[in-house]
Amino acid sequence: MSDYKSLKVAELREKLAEKGLSTAGNKAELVSRLTAATESNDENTSNNNATDLGDLAPPEDDIDWGDMENDTISTDVNKPAEPESKETSAPAAAVEIEKENESIISKETSQAPETSTGAEEHQETTEESKQSVSNEVSSPDVAKEQEKLIQRAKRFGIPVDDEQIKKAARAARFGIQQPLASSNNKNHNQSKNPQNRSNSRSKQRNKNAPPKSAPSKRKSNILDDPIEAEKARKRAERFGVAAKN
């Protein structure tokens, strides 16, 4: 029948299996087999109704088969309702993705100021440490010590070294031995005593002079030994050679 042609092969095979018929063959064979089975069933039912009802049974031509076609059409029309649910769910998924992206962006923006504040704090600490060091170097105590050392160097006619004076002033402030004062006193004592000055010059001259060679010892001769000399003389007489003095 015409309504079987609109069905799929799988549906046709299901109907044939329900009726106990063979499901082998292509779609046309399945449709023809199914229509033949339905026609035979309809004939049997009509015959039974005719025997039961007699003249009250309607003829086959008066049976309206349009209701069955409408049923199949209504089922076909109602089937494409599923993709609509998928289409409606797609915008909802897109909205959820947009919300997730917005939350990620908000987290990144909230974390960015924390890193900037950490860099600013580090910069402030470095500036404070530099300022504290400069305050230590330029404190009034260090300036006073520098002035004292400069005046002392001028008094004894010693050349002034700014870097050495700074180190000595810093050492005096923290209670460390002052290398500048000790070196200045040493130079002053050497310049004041001429004997010390001459001794230092002689020491310097001795350092620069080449080392003196040790006196060479006279090589010992074998003939200096009287025993060895006698042996040599006898050997010379034996071989007819004149003995060496």
From Swiss-Prot:
UniProt biased composition (Basic and acidic residues): 119-130
Biased segments, Acidic residues type: 58-70
UniProt region (Disordered), positions on chain: 32-245
One Pfam family of this chain: SAP
SUPFAM superfamilies in UniProt: SAP domain
GO cellular component: nucleus
Polar residues biased stretches: 109-118
Composition skew (Low complexity), residue ranges: 37-52, 182-196
A biological process term (GO) from this entry: poly(A)+ mRNA export from nucleus
Matches recorded under Gene3D superfamilies: SAP domain
Similarity section: Belongs to the SAP domain-containing ribonucleoprotein family.
Protein name: Protein mlo1
Species: Schizosaccharomyces pombe (strain 972 / ATCC 24843)
